[in-house]
């Protein structure tokens, strides 16, 4: 359907019998109305043409060949005085054969039939609205008990005589002769309410607003009663309150959607378009048909038998009519949900027939496999691996995927820059992987975001936008911080990449879907880009050194194993000297020493710090103070060193750290400075 804003959408719900008939009804030039499927046949065994008024009828569902009717005529062969839209002989409309993918038919049921989804679903919507036990409603629908009090408000024989228990037996004896009389149909329509027709009458008599008011009053009474102390009674009261809330919500939903409750009982059964339930002829005279066709045949046969019995109701026994109604109900239940009545229907090879529910639901159903998970152009798929050098908004695309996605853009730029003269030569350059191709590809990718999606897409963070970069290999590289939004990890998970083509899609990707703009959970507002797993282990290894400060040198010096014998009588062991640990004036010098392998990642070192950033605690006492001949001194603390002159002025400060701490600090500092610049730019 298309709403007022021209957004294409799909809505599943209840429809009226008039709407079902409008989907399928056609009026021929001679005034004949077609659309009802009355025969269970499909194709004629001799001519291989669809049977008239059957499940594949061309009058109902449209022609098999575009513009050619069942007679073999085309629109050009129609006489001038005839309607050009229909064939006067066979009544087939001259339209495109693709109409058989969406043109529907219907089956006019001889008796009302309850929809199994609304009767046996959990919770049962019919039982909730009627406020009756599900077992009793099922017994009424499937004829387990033959008659009930009528739903009409006029006085009847059963209503007057069935109110007293001592008269029930005499009532039954007086009614039983009517089941074999010729006037059973009249008696049944007035005195007996059974089957789905009784459910439909009760649903039609409901006033949804009164249901909401009465349920609200009862809920308030139960709320005012409070707890009685009896666990069993309190439990029943809680269950009743939950039921009343659910009933009010259901009635409110029916009112808001303009849906009538009696539509849950079917009088017309829609028939799917033929292309959605095809019959395929294979080599060797083998025919492969959809299971839904067999289930439709079963419904039509039983419905025709019931219609025949109702026409001859004066001769047909009442028990036979009621039994046939039950068979029609079971056939429709099997069509909608084959497992609703216990054992599903099987074919001659003991294979279970697939019902409409089986075709729709599940991972291999119509929605998840065909509509939601179908293959689309300008998309790819690969395994994800960690990309530690990527920014939060970047992803690494393999060369093979990138050149396929951006092939048309690369061809356009090759021709625009006069690197090639036509498309054929451009494709050959791409096939031969010439250097100019990769240069243009990187230029194209620089201004074009891509979308990454991991199934199942349970919330909006399941698909996010990234700036692509070229990487070697055949895997997609991803920043580890964005994995939580996708619920992904690097143990073989796959992700799909899509290319937004239109300017509107690219603008939406940049403004709303970029990963660095989705840092909070849309459900609860908590940060969703937090370090986990590998990142936490990496940060731990990076900052594992320098925990005890300079005291570690006095009690467990760096490089001493537990089994190594230490000479504690040596006075130089406790004495601090500058030669033991290197001093660096900046972090760049420390990184250069690490690249030259003069220090390790967790080796302790002294780094000169800024004087304007005080790190000395007011109550902290130096561990050791060293004086030099020129009056300078060194105050040694647990994690820092203060160098002063003879005037007691601080000349420099050194902190005791490791290269891992320096690298971690630099990353945080750059991230904060980048955020500050971006924030000031937006202001």
Swiss-Prot record:
One GO MF term attached to the UniProt entry: DNA-directed RNA polymerase activity
GO CC terms: chloroplast; DNA-directed RNA polymerase complex; mitochondrion
Residues given in the record as Zn(2+) binding sites: 69, 71, 87, 90
SUPFAM superfamilies in UniProt: beta and beta-prime subunits of DNA dependent RNA-polymerase (SSF64484)
Transmembrane segments: none
UniProt keyword Translocase present: no
Entries under InterPro entries matching the protein: DNA-dir_RpoC_beta_prime (IPR045867), RNA_pol_asu (IPR000722), RNA_pol_N (IPR006592), RNA_pol_Rpb1_1 (IPR007080), RNA_pol_Rpb1_3_sf (IPR042102), RNA_pol_Rpb1_clamp_domain (IPR044893), RNApol_RpoC1 (IPR034678)
The keyword Nuclease is assigned to this record: no
Entry's family note: Belongs to the RNA polymerase beta' chain family. RpoC1 subfamily.
Subunit field text: In plastids the minimal PEP RNA polymerase catalytic core is composed of four subunits: alpha, beta, beta', and beta''. When a (nuclear-encoded) sigma factor is associated with the core the holoenzyme is formed, which can initiate transcription.
Name of the protein: DNA-directed RNA polymerase subunit beta'
Gene that this polypeptide is encoded by: rpoC1
